[in-house]
Amino acid sequence: MKVILKEDFINLGREGDTVEVRDGFARNYLLPKGFAVFSNKHNVEIFNQKRRSILKKQETKKQIANDLKSKLDLVKLEFFMKSNDSGKLFHSINSLNIAEELFKLGFDIERKKIDIHHGTLKTFGTYDVTIKLYEGISSIIKVEIKKEEKQEDKKPLNKKLNKVDEQAERERV
């Protein structure tokens, strides 16, 4: 079945493109959700008239994606995770965790645009994560998973710091 897309679809086409899809996909998903319309003479004429505005909109999206790429290339995310004694993480990092951290930094990135090559990150280390922004435009951010120090480890360190502070205080007086 031929349909005309009303918005961009990854691996399918861009807004205004006439594409051939399976009947069930068109009837059960694209048409009811308003993502596409039937490709008939009337709809083709309407989209031909809108072609300039569609091209201008695509150029704007491309420019926004390039600006976002330049900002995202500077981002490095750090996650502090708990692990067992052998170093295995209790919780893995997935695209949702990365999307939430990016949102905290002011980037509104959809989860489906984040591509973790291994699916989830399950061990300590530094990883490259690809974010697909627009056709052919993607950004690679660094994601580092570090070990969260246990409370027991922090207490002696704080006591040592307090002793150093007390000695410095005595020397001032």
From Swiss-Prot:
The record's SUPFAM superfamilies line, in alphabetical order, gives: L9 N-domain-like (SSF55658), Ribosomal protein L9 C-domain (SSF55653)
Keywords recorded for this protein, A-Z:
Ribonucleoprotein, Ribosomal protein, RNA-binding, rRNA-binding
Q: Which GO terms describe its cellular component?
A: ribonucleoprotein complex; ribosome
Ranges for the region named Disordered are: 148-173
- Membrane spanning stretches: none
Pfam families (UniProt xref)? Ribosomal_L9_C, Ribosomal_L9_N
What biological process terms from GO does the record include?
translation
- Write one Gene Ontology MF term: structural constituent of ribosome
Keyword Ribosomal protein tagged = yes
**UniProt cross-references to InterPro entries, sorted A to Z:** Ribosomal_bL9 (IPR000244), Ribosomal_bL9/RNase_H1_N (IPR009027), Ribosomal_bL9_bac/chp (IPR020594), Ribosomal_bL9_C (IPR020069), Ribosomal_bL9_C_sf (IPR036791), Ribosomal_bL9_N (IPR020070), Ribosomal_bL9_N_sf (IPR036935)
Q: Which domain of life is it from?
A: Bacteria
Q: Does the keyword Ribonucleoprotein apply?
A: yes
Entry's family note: Belongs to the bacterial ribosomal protein bL9 family.
Instruction: Give a short account of what the protein does.
Output: Binds to the 23S rRNA.
What name does this protein carry? Large ribosomal subunit protein bL9
Q: What species is this protein from?
A: Borreliella afzelii (strain PKo) (Borrelia afzelii)
Q: Which gene encodes it?
A: rplI
